[in-house]
Amino acid sequence: MARLSQVSPDELILDLENPRIPDARFANEIEAIAYLYSQADLGELIQSIGNSGWLDFEPLIVEESTRTVIEGNRRLAALRIIANHQLQQRFKVTLPKPLHLNAKPDEIQVNYVGSRNEARDFIGFKHVNGAFKWDSYAKAKFAHS
């Protein structure tokens, strides 16, 4: 059964076998972050968190025994870059100035699960049948209002 908790992002591990990236496996977190940065609009997410702060409204789903993030790898990768100057240099990321006070949270909300199978229903709904993706105009209009 899932269990809600607060945890330091530093204690979590990116999923090196992320099913959303079926054609790639990573040797380490740096490779996973590089892929997410180049292929999954991580730059936009970093800027959003940098400007508005971490919004803890949707818990990451984490396999408790391994601390592996099953759902929320983009968000964790963004936090990793925001918190690490060497990663910022590697990916040529310029953070907003001033950086929002809550852009580097000490703790984030996670939903611990016992296994990947326990998380499948939620992840399947979100990513297979999930919310309709907004186009650029809709995003801009919402941000402006």
What is the role of each PLM region?
Residues 1-98, 107-109:
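Short, charged/polar connector segments at secondary-structure boundaries
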Residues 26-36, 94-145:
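Amphipathic, charge-rich alpha-helical segments that serve as recognition/docking helices
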